[in-house]
A protein has these predicted regions:
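Extracytoplasmic/periplasmic solute-binding protein
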Residues: 69, 133-139, 143, 181-194, ...
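Paired acidic/hydrophobic, glycine-rich loop segments that form the ligand-binding mouth/hinge
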Residues: 136-140, 328-333
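Short, solvent-exposed loop/beta-turn-alpha elements that line the ligand-binding surface or hinge
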Residues: 160-171, 219-222, 271-294, 356-364
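Conserved N-terminal structural module of periplasmic/extracytoplasmic solute-binding proteins
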Residues: 2-153, 401, 457-485
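A structural signal for short loop-to-beta-strand junctions that line the ligand-binding cleft
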Residues: 126-130, 134-145, 155-158, 164-209, ...
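Extracytoplasmic/periplasmic substrate-recognition and gating elements
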Residues: 342-412
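C-terminal capping/gating helix-and-loop segments adjacent to ligand/active sites or protein-protein/ligand interfaces
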Residues: 404-410, 421-485
Length: 485
């Protein structure tokens, strides 16, 4: 489609926000705590949350603060002071009210704490743990920067050592946490409070109708939404404006940043960057678990990347095609951008990334959000009971935040756009993590393997075999060092 030169890999600040499903955790009740007032409140209403599960946490007054380090997260979606709350903004109201409910229930005020930037924060956390300083109660990490440092420096405590935490509660993503266990410990957590971030596929409803193409919502619901189907529908749109050049002024079936969003195709097609051996527990580079399938996916994506029906801009020095201007049927899109897209005039729909084929059972979306960690100093010098209870309530009272967030993403009330909201539900419920992405900075070779698919698309001289020869062994050594295996 267009001539492209190889580009140097640019480490991505996945400073994203977003969401997931919602509610929070059950915990232990102290014997001397009032038994009549729990997290459900005196009226039994769970802070207007939609879940039926209610954490059994007694009302008390710790009279303290809960200090949160947030790296790579949109802070306004986590904690919002009253003076920053915009009147009439339902999302601001929900975030603010969540903090009020936690304070009323536990006498704990949630505040942000400074631990440096995304490069230095892990070192500062490790230092507070080493000296036994209970300065921070929660760290929300970058998607991968600093995560392995926190693990290898023994700076995080096991979530199951927090007395109040019940990982079986609906607001914890236990499946994701299981995939990230280290030595059978849950050092990295994930709950609805994190407001997940991933990539999705948006489509132009008017363009779809004008070209009389299949309804993608029906394809998703009927489990027929596959890579081949996406690219087949996209191939129906390829219109040059007459100047003989393929630019943002022409019309395409599919568009997007030809870098980070391409990585999610590996996950959506039910393959992993790094997996764990069920027998030995050893983490290993997993690209060769199904070489034939991987080669097939690479061929499909690179063919799309070069086709005249696609406009995929490169990793750097690019001109992006703005989806809202109506020049693309589909676009690979970050869920963080849906709120701003909903303010545009374009009529759009939202889809999960496609499956590899119809035989694949589930849709899968790669988590591009950071993770939760509780500094080990909490166990040594702090109050694990209080920390666990706060984490419970923060997740539980995210119900109204989720509803407001959905409506901002859709540009309409959920009740008025149920079909679109159902797609968002599918996306959030399909969220998975990959230890390869989390360990991206464990070595330069692991970084290369994480970005393998977009790098192959950008450079015709690169291929799967050469990538594995050049990076597999070194990446494995990095994993072995991180997990001491």
């Amino acid at each position: 489609m267009k001539n492209r030169l190889p580009h140097l890999i640019a480490m991505l600040l996945a400073c994203l926000m977003l969401l997931s499903s919602v509610s929070i955790l059950a915990g232990c009740v102290k014997e001397d705590a009032p038994a009549t007032e729990t997290a459900s409140g005196q009226n039994g209403a769970a802070g207007e949350t939609s879940t039926e599960y209610v954490p059994d946490i007694a009302k008390k007054n710790y009279n303290t603060t809960f200090n949160v380090v947030a790296i790579g997260f949109n802070q306004d979606l986590l904690i919002l002071d009253e003076d920053k709350k915009r009147d009439g903004n339902s999302l601001d109201e929900a975030v603010y009210e969540r903090g009020v409910l936690v304070k009323e229930q536990l006498g704990v005020e949630c505040k942000f704490a400074d631990a440096g930037d995304w490069i230095s924060y892990s070192g500062k956390i490790a230092n507070t743990v080493q000296i036994g300083d209970d300065a921070y109660q929660l760290v929300l990490t970058h998607v991968y920067q600093g995560v392995t440092d926190l693990v290898t420096s023994n700076s995080l405590m096991n979530f199951t050592d927090l007395p109040s935490v019940n990982l079986d509660a609906p607001y914890w993503n236990r499946n994701l946490m299981e995939s990230l266990k280290v030595d059978d410990r849950y050092l990295l957590g994930y709950s609805d409070f994190c407001l997940s971030s991933t990539h999705c596929v948006v489509f132009n409803k008017d363009m779809l109708q004008n070209y009389r193409l299949e309804d993608p919502y029906a394809l998703v619901n009927n489990k027929k939404w596959t890579v081949d189907k996406l690219f087949s529908l996209a191939s129906a749109v390829s219109e040059d404006n007459g100047d003989g050049k393929w630019t943002v002024d022409d019309y395409y079936g599919i568009s997007g940043w030809g870098w980070v969003p391409l990585i999610t195709f590996i996950t959506s097609c039910d393959m992993k960057i790094v997996d764990r051996d069920e027998d030995t527990g050893r983490y290993y580079v997993a690209y060769e678990d199904n070489t034939e399938k991987m080669l097939s996916l690479i061929d499909k994506v690179t063919t799309m990347y070069k086709a005249n029906y696609s406009y995929m801009w490169p990793s750097v020095n690019y001109t992006a095609l703005k989806f809202a201007e109506g020049h693309s049927l589909f676009q690979l899109y970050s869920t963080t951008g849906l709120i701003s897209l909903a303010t545009e005039k374009i009529r759009f729909g939202v889809l999960p990334y496609p499956k590899f084929d119809e035989k694949q059972e589930n849709y899968r979306s790669l988590n591009w959000n950071g993770l939760m960690g509780v500094p080990a100093s909490v166990n040594k010098a702090g109050n694990p009971q209080m920390v666990g209870e706060v984490l419970e309530l923060l997740g539980y009272y995210t119900g109204t935040v989720k509803t407001a967030y959905y409506e901002l993403q859709l540009g309409a009330k959920v009740s008025e756009a149920q079909e679109d909201a159902d797609m968002l539900d599918i996306i959030w419920k399909s969220l998975v993590s990959d230890i390869g992405l989390v360990c991206c900075n464990s070595s330069g070779s692991m970084d290369n393997l994480v970005y393998m698919l977009p790098m192959i698309c950008e450079s015709p001289k690169k291929n799967f075999s050469s990538f594995m020869r050049s990076n597999k062994d070194s990446a494995q050594k990095g994993l072995d060092k991180v997990f001491k295996q």
